[in-house]
Amino acid sequence: MIRLMQESDVDHVAAIECLVQTHPWSKQQFQESLVSHQCTVYEQANQVVGFCILQPVLDEANLLLMAIHPSQQGKGLGYALLDYSIEQLKNNPIQIFLEVRESNRAAIRLYEKAQFHQIDLRKNYYPNGDGSREHAVIMVRTCTDDFAALFQ
């Protein structure tokens, strides 16, 4: 079941975040996101196994964070969660932006399947645990067939 994130989900969401990110968000950041962002979770057998945080901004949105528990990856849950979360955006965005580590090929494939495409590369953006840095792939999904709306 996919539903809106609740404050009682924050511990589970933060635990998943720690499993998949080298620089995870804090519990406080997740709690603050509940106020101003659209936060959804994927729940199976009363257990949160994934989450998605979208930031609506005027007529656009930013995908800030998304993760599926490693034991549940590769089962289509991420695509279902992303698709549902985008459909629930109340601002009907013209475009949705995201950035992802260049090495995160599984996430890039998921985003491409969800109709995102690369528009830029932010060099040396993400810090790695060993002190090196990694490029961020900037992607966008256009949510309108009205080409003129992109330039208003």
Language-model-detected regions and their locations in the chain:
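Conserved catalytic-core motifs of GNAT/GCN5-like acyltransferases
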Residues: 59, 97-99, 117-134
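Conserved SAM-binding loop
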Residues: 2, 100
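Acetyl-CoA-dependent GNAT
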Residues: 4-71, 79-89, 142-152
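Conserved beta-strand edge residues that scaffold enzyme active sites
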Residues: 31, 103, 125-126
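Short aromatic/hydrophobic contact patches that present stacked aromatics
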Residues: 67, 97-99, 138-140
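Short hydrophobic/aromatic beta-strand or adjacent loop that forms the aromatic wall/cage
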Residues: 37-39, 133-138
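Conserved GNAT acetyl-CoA-binding A-motif
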Residues: 89-99
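Conserved glycine-rich acetyl-CoA-binding loop
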Residues: 47, 66-83, 101-109, 113-114, ...
